[in-house]
Protein backbone atom coordinates (compact mmCIF):
# COMPACT_ATOMS: atom_id res chain seq x y z
CA UNK A 1 0.00 0.00 0.00
CA UNK A 2 1.17 3.51 -0.81
CA UNK A 3 0.54 5.55 2.32
CA UNK A 4 1.90 8.84 0.94
CA UNK A 5 -0.92 9.47 -1.54
CA UNK A 6 -4.74 9.54 -1.25
CA UNK A 7 -6.60 6.25 -1.60
CA UNK A 8 -10.05 5.99 -3.06
CA UNK A 9 -11.99 3.95 -0.51
CA UNK A 10 -14.25 2.06 -2.95
CA UNK A 11 -13.72 -1.69 -3.19
CA UNK A 12 -13.61 -1.42 -6.98
CA UNK A 13 -14.14 1.62 -9.19
CA UNK A 14 -14.69 -0.12 -12.53
CA UNK A 15 -18.41 0.69 -12.72
CA UNK A 16 -17.84 4.19 -11.33
CA UNK A 17 -15.30 4.84 -14.08
CA UNK A 18 -17.89 3.86 -16.68
CA UNK A 19 -20.42 6.21 -15.02
CA UNK A 20 -18.05 9.18 -14.75
CA UNK A 21 -16.05 8.59 -17.94
CA UNK A 22 -13.70 11.43 -18.85
CA UNK A 23 -14.07 13.04 -15.41
CA UNK A 24 -13.22 9.97 -13.31
CA UNK A 25 -9.59 10.94 -12.61
CA UNK A 26 -10.22 14.71 -12.62
CA UNK A 27 -13.03 14.42 -10.07
CA UNK A 28 -10.74 12.63 -7.64
CA UNK A 29 -7.58 14.69 -8.11
CA UNK A 30 -9.72 17.76 -7.36
CA UNK A 31 -11.42 16.06 -4.41
CA UNK A 32 -8.11 14.96 -2.88
CA UNK A 33 -6.21 18.09 -3.98
CA UNK A 34 -3.50 15.82 -5.31
CA UNK A 35 -2.03 15.07 -8.74
CA UNK A 36 -2.19 11.37 -8.02
CA UNK A 37 -4.22 8.86 -6.06
CA UNK A 38 -4.62 5.12 -5.76
CA UNK A 39 -7.79 3.27 -6.73
CA UNK A 40 -8.92 -0.26 -7.49
CA UNK A 41 -10.00 -0.93 -11.06
CA UNK A 42 -10.69 -4.29 -12.69
CA UNK A 43 -9.73 -5.93 -9.39
CA UNK A 44 -6.23 -4.37 -9.34
CA UNK A 45 -4.58 -1.40 -7.65
CA UNK A 46 -3.96 1.49 -10.04
CA UNK A 47 -2.15 4.78 -9.56
CA UNK A 48 -4.05 7.51 -11.41
CA UNK A 49 -2.33 10.81 -12.16
CA UNK A 50 -2.81 14.10 -13.98
CA UNK A 51 -0.92 17.19 -15.16
CA UNK A 52 2.12 18.05 -17.28
CA UNK A 53 4.66 16.89 -14.68
CA UNK A 54 2.85 13.57 -14.36
CA UNK A 55 2.84 13.24 -18.16
CA UNK A 56 6.59 13.87 -18.25
CA UNK A 57 7.12 10.99 -15.82
CA UNK A 58 4.60 8.75 -17.61
CA UNK A 59 6.48 9.11 -20.92
CA UNK A 60 9.87 8.28 -19.38
CA UNK A 61 10.66 4.95 -21.07
CA UNK A 62 13.17 4.08 -18.33
CA UNK A 63 10.36 4.14 -15.78
CA UNK A 64 7.34 2.85 -17.70
CA UNK A 65 6.57 0.11 -20.20
CA UNK A 66 3.60 -0.53 -22.47
CA UNK A 67 4.08 -4.29 -22.83
CA UNK A 68 1.29 -6.13 -20.95
CA UNK A 69 -0.30 -2.80 -19.96
CA UNK A 70 -3.28 -2.97 -22.31
CA UNK A 71 -6.24 -5.10 -21.15
CA UNK A 72 -7.07 -7.86 -23.63
CA UNK A 73 -10.57 -6.39 -24.08
CA UNK A 74 -8.96 -3.21 -25.49
CA UNK A 75 -6.55 -5.18 -27.69
CA UNK A 76 -9.38 -7.30 -29.06
CA UNK A 77 -11.43 -4.27 -30.04
CA UNK A 78 -9.46 -1.04 -30.44
CA UNK A 79 -5.78 -1.74 -31.11
CA UNK A 80 -5.38 -5.39 -32.08
CA UNK A 81 -3.49 -8.07 -30.14
CA UNK A 82 0.27 -7.47 -29.65
CA UNK A 83 0.27 -4.33 -31.82
CA UNK A 84 2.63 -1.33 -31.67
CA UNK A 85 0.79 0.27 -28.71
CA UNK A 86 2.04 -2.55 -26.46
CA UNK A 87 5.68 -2.57 -27.57
CA UNK A 88 8.79 -1.16 -25.88
CA UNK A 89 12.49 -0.58 -26.49
CA UNK A 90 14.28 -0.90 -29.81
CA UNK A 91 11.54 -3.11 -31.30
CA UNK A 92 9.02 -0.35 -30.60
CA UNK A 93 11.24 2.36 -32.12
CA UNK A 94 11.87 0.19 -35.20
CA UNK A 95 8.12 -0.34 -35.70
CA UNK A 96 7.40 3.32 -34.89
CA UNK A 97 9.76 4.48 -37.66
CA UNK A 98 7.60 2.51 -40.11
CA UNK A 99 4.51 4.42 -38.96
CA UNK A 100 6.31 7.78 -38.97
CA UNK A 101 7.55 7.17 -42.54
CA UNK A 102 3.89 7.07 -43.60
CA UNK A 103 2.96 10.26 -41.77
CA UNK A 104 5.47 12.80 -43.04
CA UNK A 105 4.38 16.33 -44.11
CA UNK A 106 3.97 15.27 -47.79
CA UNK A 107 1.65 12.44 -46.68
CA UNK A 108 -0.26 14.87 -44.43
CA UNK A 109 -0.63 17.31 -47.34
CA UNK A 110 -1.84 14.57 -49.69
CA UNK A 111 -4.49 13.37 -47.24
CA UNK A 112 -5.70 16.94 -46.69
CA UNK A 113 -5.98 17.45 -50.46
CA UNK A 114 -7.93 14.21 -50.87
CA UNK A 115 -10.28 15.28 -48.08
CA UNK A 116 -10.97 18.60 -49.78
CA UNK A 117 -11.73 16.82 -53.07
CA UNK A 118 -14.12 14.39 -51.36
CA UNK A 119 -15.90 17.14 -49.41
CA UNK A 120 -16.47 19.11 -52.61
CA UNK A 121 -17.75 16.02 -54.42
CA UNK A 122 -20.20 15.35 -51.57
CA UNK A 123 -21.85 18.77 -51.89
CA UNK A 124 -23.62 17.83 -55.14
CA UNK A 125 -25.42 15.03 -53.30
CA UNK A 126 -26.00 17.10 -50.17
CA UNK A 127 -27.67 19.92 -52.09
CA UNK A 128 -30.41 17.46 -53.13
CA UNK A 129 -30.91 16.08 -49.61
CA UNK A 130 -33.22 17.55 -46.97
CA UNK A 131 -30.53 17.01 -44.37
CA UNK A 132 -27.33 15.09 -43.75
CA UNK A 133 -25.68 13.80 -40.57
CA UNK A 134 -22.11 15.06 -40.55
CA UNK A 135 -20.71 12.16 -38.50
CA UNK A 136 -22.11 9.56 -40.92
CA UNK A 137 -20.79 11.49 -43.92
CA UNK A 138 -17.39 12.18 -42.35
CA UNK A 139 -16.64 8.59 -41.39
CA UNK A 140 -17.40 7.32 -44.91
CA UNK A 141 -15.41 10.08 -46.59
CA UNK A 142 -12.47 9.48 -44.24
CA UNK A 143 -12.64 5.72 -44.88
CA UNK A 144 -12.67 6.27 -48.64
CA UNK A 145 -9.78 8.74 -48.46
CA UNK A 146 -7.70 6.66 -46.02
CA UNK A 147 -7.98 3.51 -48.14
CA UNK A 148 -7.23 5.32 -51.41
CA UNK A 149 -4.19 7.05 -49.89
CA UNK A 150 -2.99 3.78 -48.30
CA UNK A 151 -3.32 1.83 -51.57
CA UNK A 152 -6.05 -0.39 -50.11
CA UNK A 153 -8.63 -1.41 -52.76
CA UNK A 154 -12.12 -0.45 -51.58
CA UNK A 155 -15.31 -0.93 -53.57
CA UNK A 156 -17.87 1.86 -53.25
CA UNK A 157 -20.44 -0.74 -52.15
CA UNK A 158 -18.35 -1.64 -49.09
CA UNK A 159 -17.40 1.87 -47.90
CA UNK A 160 -20.18 2.05 -45.31
CA UNK A 161 -19.49 -1.42 -43.91
CA UNK A 162 -15.74 -0.80 -43.55
CA UNK A 163 -16.24 2.69 -42.09
CA UNK A 164 -18.74 1.31 -39.57
CA UNK A 165 -16.30 -1.45 -38.56
CA UNK A 166 -13.50 1.05 -37.93
CA UNK A 167 -15.78 3.29 -35.87
CA UNK A 168 -17.21 0.31 -33.94
CA UNK A 169 -13.65 -0.61 -32.86
CA UNK A 170 -13.17 2.92 -31.52
CA UNK A 171 -16.62 3.03 -29.91
CA UNK A 172 -15.94 -0.23 -28.04
CA UNK A 173 -13.11 1.33 -26.01
CA UNK A 174 -15.15 2.69 -23.12
CA UNK A 175 -18.09 0.32 -23.36
CA UNK A 176 -19.43 -2.86 -21.84
CA UNK A 177 -22.20 -4.97 -23.29
CA UNK A 178 -23.49 -4.59 -26.87
CA UNK A 179 -21.26 -1.62 -27.84
CA UNK A 180 -18.14 -3.49 -26.75
CA UNK A 181 -19.10 -6.71 -28.51
CA UNK A 182 -19.94 -4.82 -31.69
CA UNK A 183 -16.32 -3.65 -31.75
CA UNK A 184 -15.06 -7.14 -30.90
CA UNK A 185 -16.94 -8.54 -33.91
CA UNK A 186 -15.76 -5.74 -36.21
CA UNK A 187 -12.07 -6.38 -35.56
CA UNK A 188 -11.71 -9.93 -36.96
CA UNK A 189 -13.80 -8.91 -39.98
CA UNK A 190 -11.42 -6.05 -40.72
CA UNK A 191 -8.30 -8.10 -39.98
CA UNK A 192 -9.38 -10.89 -42.35
CA UNK A 193 -10.21 -8.35 -45.08
CA UNK A 194 -6.79 -6.66 -44.85
CA UNK A 195 -4.84 -9.90 -44.31
CA UNK A 196 -5.99 -11.20 -47.71
CA UNK A 197 -4.54 -8.04 -49.29
CA UNK A 198 -1.23 -8.45 -47.44
CA UNK A 199 -0.97 -12.05 -48.67
CA UNK A 200 -1.99 -11.12 -52.22
CA UNK A 201 0.57 -8.29 -52.28
CA UNK A 202 3.33 -10.66 -51.15
CA UNK A 203 2.29 -13.25 -53.73
CA UNK A 204 2.30 -10.65 -56.51
CA UNK A 205 -1.45 -11.02 -57.05
CA UNK A 206 -2.11 -7.43 -55.95
CA UNK A 207 0.07 -4.67 -57.33
CA UNK A 208 1.21 -2.21 -54.67
CA UNK A 209 3.10 1.05 -54.88
CA UNK A 210 6.20 1.69 -52.81
CA UNK A 211 5.55 4.34 -50.17
CA UNK A 212 1.89 3.44 -49.65
CA UNK A 213 0.81 2.07 -46.29
CA UNK A 214 -0.30 -1.26 -47.80
CA UNK A 215 3.05 -1.81 -49.52
CA UNK A 216 5.16 -0.74 -46.55
CA UNK A 217 3.24 -2.90 -44.07
CA UNK A 218 3.28 -5.92 -46.41
CA UNK A 219 7.03 -5.77 -46.99
CA UNK A 220 8.28 -4.32 -43.69
CA UNK A 221 11.15 -6.24 -42.13
CA UNK A 222 11.63 -6.49 -38.39
CA UNK A 223 14.94 -6.05 -36.55
CA UNK A 224 15.83 -9.70 -37.19
CA UNK A 225 15.18 -9.32 -40.93
CA UNK A 226 11.92 -11.29 -40.96
CA UNK A 227 8.63 -9.98 -42.31
CA UNK A 228 5.67 -9.43 -40.01
CA UNK A 229 3.31 -12.38 -40.16
CA UNK A 230 0.38 -11.52 -42.42
CA UNK A 231 -2.13 -11.09 -39.55
CA UNK A 232 0.21 -8.74 -37.65
CA UNK A 233 0.84 -6.73 -40.83
CA UNK A 234 -2.95 -6.45 -41.22
CA UNK A 235 -3.34 -5.33 -37.60
CA UNK A 236 -0.73 -2.61 -38.05
CA UNK A 237 -2.26 -1.43 -41.33
CA UNK A 238 -5.58 -1.13 -39.49
CA UNK A 239 -3.66 0.95 -36.92
CA UNK A 240 -3.00 3.39 -39.76
CA UNK A 241 -6.51 3.36 -41.25
CA UNK A 242 -8.70 3.27 -38.13
CA UNK A 243 -7.29 6.43 -36.49
CA UNK A 244 -7.80 8.36 -39.73
CA UNK A 245 -11.47 7.32 -39.82
CA UNK A 246 -11.71 8.28 -36.12
CA UNK A 247 -10.88 11.89 -37.04
CA UNK A 248 -14.63 12.04 -37.79
CA UNK A 249 -15.17 12.62 -34.05
CA UNK A 250 -12.99 15.73 -34.16
CA UNK A 251 -14.68 16.96 -37.34
CA UNK A 252 -18.10 16.84 -35.69
CA UNK A 253 -16.74 18.71 -32.68
CA UNK A 254 -15.27 21.31 -35.08
CA UNK A 255 -18.73 21.85 -36.56
CA UNK A 256 -20.22 22.02 -33.07
CA UNK A 257 -17.63 24.63 -32.06
CA UNK A 258 -18.51 26.77 -35.10
CA UNK A 259 -22.19 26.48 -34.18
CA UNK A 260 -21.73 27.22 -30.47
CA UNK A 261 -19.20 30.02 -31.04
CA UNK A 262 -20.35 31.68 -34.29
CA UNK A 263 -18.05 34.70 -33.87
CA UNK A 264 -15.17 32.46 -34.93
CA UNK A 265 -16.68 31.91 -38.38
CA UNK A 266 -15.87 35.50 -39.34
CA UNK A 267 -12.53 35.26 -37.55
CA UNK A 268 -11.67 32.21 -39.68
CA UNK A 269 -13.00 33.76 -42.89
CA UNK A 270 -10.79 36.80 -42.51
CA UNK A 271 -7.82 34.73 -41.33
CA UNK A 272 -5.53 32.16 -42.90
CA UNK A 273 -3.90 28.83 -42.10
CA UNK A 274 -2.63 30.15 -38.75
CA UNK A 275 -6.17 30.87 -37.51
CA UNK A 276 -7.33 27.46 -38.73
CA UNK A 277 -4.49 25.80 -36.85
CA UNK A 278 -5.37 27.66 -33.62
CA UNK A 279 -9.05 26.73 -33.95
CA UNK A 280 -8.24 23.08 -34.63
CA UNK A 281 -5.87 22.90 -31.68
CA UNK A 282 -8.52 24.34 -29.37
CA UNK A 283 -11.06 21.78 -30.64
CA UNK A 284 -8.55 19.04 -29.83
CA UNK A 285 -7.87 20.47 -26.37
CA UNK A 286 -11.40 21.44 -25.36
CA UNK A 287 -13.60 18.60 -26.60
CA UNK A 288 -13.32 14.99 -25.34
CA UNK A 289 -11.38 12.41 -27.34
CA UNK A 290 -8.98 10.08 -25.51
CA UNK A 291 -9.85 9.95 -21.78
CA UNK A 292 -6.68 8.38 -20.35
CA UNK A 293 -3.78 6.07 -21.20
CA UNK A 294 -2.25 3.17 -19.30
CA UNK A 295 1.24 1.83 -18.64
CA UNK A 296 3.09 -0.46 -16.21
CA UNK A 297 5.90 0.60 -13.90
CA UNK A 298 9.14 -0.82 -15.33
CA UNK A 299 11.28 -0.47 -12.20
CA UNK A 300 10.81 0.84 -8.66
CA UNK A 301 11.05 4.62 -8.27
CA UNK A 302 9.67 7.44 -6.14
CA UNK A 303 8.00 10.55 -7.57
CA UNK A 304 5.95 13.19 -5.78
CA UNK A 305 6.22 11.26 -2.48
CA UNK A 306 4.66 8.26 -4.17
CA UNK A 307 6.33 4.86 -4.44
CA UNK A 308 5.89 3.37 -7.90
CA UNK A 309 6.56 -0.36 -7.54
CA UNK A 310 7.57 -2.48 -10.54
CA UNK A 311 4.51 -3.96 -12.25
CA UNK A 312 2.03 -1.39 -10.88
CA UNK A 313 -0.65 -0.24 -13.35
CA UNK A 314 -0.80 3.53 -13.92
CA UNK A 315 -3.35 5.71 -15.73
CA UNK A 316 -2.52 9.19 -17.07
CA UNK A 317 -5.46 11.59 -17.34
CA UNK A 318 -5.48 13.09 -20.85
CA UNK A 319 -8.76 14.98 -20.61
CA UNK A 320 -7.98 16.39 -17.17
CA UNK A 321 -4.52 17.55 -18.25
CA UNK A 322 -6.06 19.33 -21.24
CA UNK A 323 -8.37 21.10 -18.75
CA UNK A 324 -5.83 21.76 -16.01
CA UNK A 325 -6.18 25.40 -14.80
CA UNK A 326 -2.47 25.46 -13.92
CA UNK A 327 -1.68 24.91 -17.60
CA UNK A 328 -4.62 26.62 -19.30
CA UNK A 329 -6.19 29.98 -18.49
CA UNK A 330 -9.96 29.43 -18.07
CA UNK A 331 -9.69 25.85 -19.39
CA UNK A 332 -13.46 25.35 -19.62
CA UNK A 333 -13.83 28.21 -22.10
CA UNK A 334 -13.42 27.64 -25.84
CA UNK A 335 -10.74 30.17 -26.85
CA UNK A 336 -8.62 29.43 -29.94
CA UNK A 337 -6.70 32.68 -29.39
CA UNK A 338 -4.91 31.02 -26.48
CA UNK A 339 -2.64 29.34 -29.04
CA UNK A 340 -1.49 32.64 -30.61
CA UNK A 341 1.54 33.06 -28.36
CA UNK A 342 1.69 29.65 -26.76
CA UNK A 343 5.01 27.85 -26.83
CA UNK A 344 4.89 24.19 -27.75
CA UNK A 345 5.08 21.82 -24.81
CA UNK A 346 5.20 18.05 -25.24
CA UNK A 347 3.37 17.34 -22.00
CA UNK A 348 0.50 19.82 -21.49
CA UNK A 349 -1.43 19.47 -24.77
CA UNK A 350 -2.02 15.71 -24.91
CA UNK A 351 -5.32 14.78 -26.61
CA UNK A 352 -3.41 12.07 -28.52
CA UNK A 353 -0.72 11.42 -25.93
CA UNK A 354 2.45 13.25 -24.91
CA UNK A 355 6.21 13.13 -25.28
CA UNK A 356 8.12 12.56 -28.51
CA UNK A 357 6.50 10.71 -31.41
CA UNK A 358 9.93 9.53 -32.63
CA UNK A 359 11.32 8.12 -29.40
CA UNK A 360 8.22 7.52 -27.30
CA UNK A 361 4.54 6.63 -27.43
CA UNK A 362 2.98 9.85 -28.71
CA UNK A 363 0.53 9.18 -31.56
CA UNK A 364 2.46 9.29 -34.86
CA UNK A 365 -0.67 10.43 -36.72
CA UNK A 366 -1.12 13.72 -34.88
CA UNK A 367 0.08 15.75 -37.88
CA UNK A 368 -2.38 13.95 -40.15
CA UNK A 369 -5.19 14.67 -37.69
CA UNK A 370 -4.38 18.39 -37.62
CA UNK A 371 -4.05 18.76 -41.41
CA UNK A 372 -7.25 16.80 -42.14
CA UNK A 373 -9.09 18.90 -39.55
CA UNK A 374 -7.76 22.14 -41.06
CA UNK A 375 -8.82 21.12 -44.58
CA UNK A 376 -12.27 20.13 -43.33
CA UNK A 377 -12.66 23.34 -41.33
CA UNK A 378 -11.73 25.36 -44.41
CA UNK A 379 -14.45 23.51 -46.33
CA UNK A 380 -17.12 24.18 -43.67
CA UNK A 381 -16.23 27.87 -43.40
CA UNK A 382 -15.37 28.83 -46.97
CA UNK A 383 -17.03 26.35 -49.33
CA UNK A 384 -20.61 25.83 -48.10
CA UNK A 385 -23.52 27.47 -46.31
CA UNK A 386 -25.82 25.32 -44.19
CA UNK A 387 -28.49 25.47 -41.52
CA UNK A 388 -28.43 23.64 -38.21
CA UNK A 389 -31.98 22.42 -37.46
CA UNK A 390 -33.22 21.78 -33.94
CA UNK A 391 -31.59 18.63 -32.59
CA UNK A 392 -29.81 17.26 -29.52
CA UNK A 393 -26.22 18.48 -29.69
CA UNK A 394 -25.56 17.39 -26.12
CA UNK A 395 -22.52 15.19 -25.62
CA UNK A 396 -21.92 13.20 -22.45
CA UNK A 397 -18.59 13.11 -20.65
CA UNK A 398 -19.71 9.77 -19.20
CA UNK A 399 -19.64 8.19 -22.67
CA UNK A 400 -16.21 7.21 -23.99
CA UNK A 401 -15.67 8.15 -26.78
CA UNK A 402 -18.14 11.03 -26.69
CA UNK A 403 -20.06 12.59 -29.57
CA UNK A 404 -23.03 14.95 -29.93
CA UNK A 405 -26.13 12.75 -29.73
CA UNK A 406 -27.47 13.80 -33.15
CA UNK A 407 -24.16 13.33 -34.96
CA UNK A 408 -24.60 16.99 -36.06
CA UNK A 409 -27.46 17.30 -38.55
CA UNK A 410 -27.07 19.90 -41.33
CA UNK A 411 -29.86 21.05 -43.65
CA UNK A 412 -30.29 23.45 -46.56
CA UNK A 413 -26.73 22.84 -47.68
CA UNK A 414 -25.61 24.96 -50.61
CA UNK A 415 -22.35 25.87 -52.25
CA UNK A 416 -20.99 29.33 -51.59
CA UNK A 417 -21.17 31.39 -54.74
UniProtKB/Swiss-Prot annotation:
Cofactor(s) annotated in UniProt: heme
Parts of the chain that traverse the membrane: none
Annotated residues for binding of heme: 363
InterPro entries linked to this entry: Cyt_P450, Cyt_P450_E_grp-I, Cyt_P450_sf, Cytochrome_P450_3A
Metal-binding in keyword set: yes
The protein's Enzyme Commission number: 1.11.2.4
Entry keyword annotation includes Heme: yes
Gene3D superfamilies: Cytochrome P450 (1.10.630.10)
Keywords carried by this UniProt record: Heme, Iron, Metal-binding, Monooxygenase, Oxidoreductase
CDD domains (UniProt xref): CYP152
A Pfam family the protein falls into: p450
Catalytic activity: a 1,2-saturated fatty acid + H2O2 = a 2-hydroxy fatty acid + H2O; a 2,3-saturated fatty acid + H2O2 = a 3-hydroxy fatty acid + H2O; tetradecanoate + H2O2 = (3R)-hydroxytetradecanoate + H2O; tetradecanoate + H2O2 = (2R)-hydroxytetradecanoate + H2O
Gene Ontology molecular function terms on file: heme binding; iron ion binding; monooxygenase activity; oxidoreductase activity, acting on paired donors, with incorporation or reduction of molecular oxygen
Cystine connections: none
Superkingdom in the source lineage: Bacteria
Similarity comment: family membership: Belongs to the cytochrome P450 family.
PANTHER family listed in its UniProt record: CYTOCHROME P450 FAMILY 3, FATTY-ACID PEROXYGENASE
Entry function: Catalyzes the alpha- and beta-hydroxylation of myristic acid in the presence of hydrogen peroxide.
Protein name listed in UniProt: Fatty-acid peroxygenase
Taxonomic source organism: Bacillus subtilis (strain 168)
